[in-house]
Amino acid sequence: MTDLTSLRLSYTRAELRREDLNPDPLRQFQGWFEEAQQADLTEPYALQLATADAQGRPSVRTVLLRGADERGLTFYTNYESHKGHDLAANPQAEVLFYWAELERQVRAFGTVSRVPEAESNDYFHKRPRESQLAAHASTPQSAPVENRAALEAKFAALHEQFPEGTTIPRPAFWGGYRVQVQEWEFWQGRPNRMHDRFRYARDGDGWRLDRLMP
């Protein structure tokens, strides 16, 4: 294996100053997100979601952002998945967006709750038909499966159960979560590891903004 101690990059693309920041962290995030989209990055809406169970054992995985507004950050998943069980026992999470080409990172921490069923229904029926069937097929999510053939057979059976032209119902075990963000951090890589970091922390009805040591 390569000697990893010799591998490093120097970040020189941009700087981040206090006067550059929007006083509203959601607007700051939306601005950066739009820049990531305009930069034609691969899945800039992919985020790493970290949760922990009742005993504090952490786990992390990649999910897709499906909404970002005053209510919070929204994603969809199987409620019976590992993350679903974590969030039922410990309804808080941290998410991470890393846009390497922009040398930027955003962290957000908050409490998590399920979105209303009507909202989950609306999104489910906007998904490609094959993805709707896959939501039914991949349950119980994270459980062992004998082999790929068993999974494909289940998927094929669902194709027969819901032929083209029929409505596929959203399964009760699948839907959305929303992270109500209490803390944001914006990171811009800088030369010599002297990075720019700013944290927004909830302070009453507003936000306290601090520059952090890199």
Swiss-Prot record:
Which BP terms does GO give this entry? pyridoxine biosynthetic process
Q: Which cofactor does it need?
A: FMN
The record's cofactor note says:
Binds 1 FMN per subunit.
Which residues does the record give as FMN binding sites? R61, T62, V63, L64, L65, R66, Y76, T77, K83, Q105, Q141, S142, W187, R197
| Gene3D superfamilies membership | Electron Transport, Fmn-binding Protein, Chain A
Q: Which reaction does it catalyse?
A: pyridoxamine 5'-phosphate + O2 + H2O = pyridoxal 5'-phosphate + H2O2 + NH4(+); pyridoxine 5'-phosphate + O2 = pyridoxal 5'-phosphate + H2O2
InterPro entries cross-referenced by the UniProt entry: Pyridox_Oxase, Pyridox_Oxase_CS, Pyridox_Oxase_N, Pyridoxamine_oxidase_dimer_C, Split_barrel_FMN-bd
Asked if the keyword Repressor belongs to this entry, the reply reads no
> Where does this protein hold substrate?
R8, L9, S10, Y11, R66, Y123, R127, S131, R193, M194, H195
Q: Which GO terms describe its molecular function?
A: FMN binding; pyridoxamine phosphate oxidase activity
Give the top-rank taxon of the lineage listed in the UniProt record for this protein.
Answer: Bacteria
Q: In which pathway does it act?
A: Cofactor metabolism; pyridoxal 5'-phosphate salvage; pyridoxal 5'-phosphate from pyridoxamine 5'-phosphate: step 1/1; Cofactor metabolism; pyridoxal 5'-phosphate salvage; pyridoxal 5'-phosphate from pyridoxine 5'-phosphate: step 1/1
Q: What is its EC number?
A: 1.4.3.5
Relate the assembly described in the record: Homodimer.
- Explain the purpose of this protein: Catalyzes the oxidation of either pyridoxine 5'-phosphate (PNP) or pyridoxamine 5'-phosphate (PMP) into pyridoxal 5'-phosphate (PLP).
Protein name listed in UniProt = Pyridoxine/pyridoxamine 5'-phosphate oxidase
Tell me what organism the protein belongs to: Deinococcus radiodurans (strain ATCC 13939 / DSM 20539 / JCM 16871 / CCUG 27074 / LMG 4051 / NBRC 15346 / NCIMB 9279 / VKM B-1422 / R1)
Gene name tied to this protein: pdxH
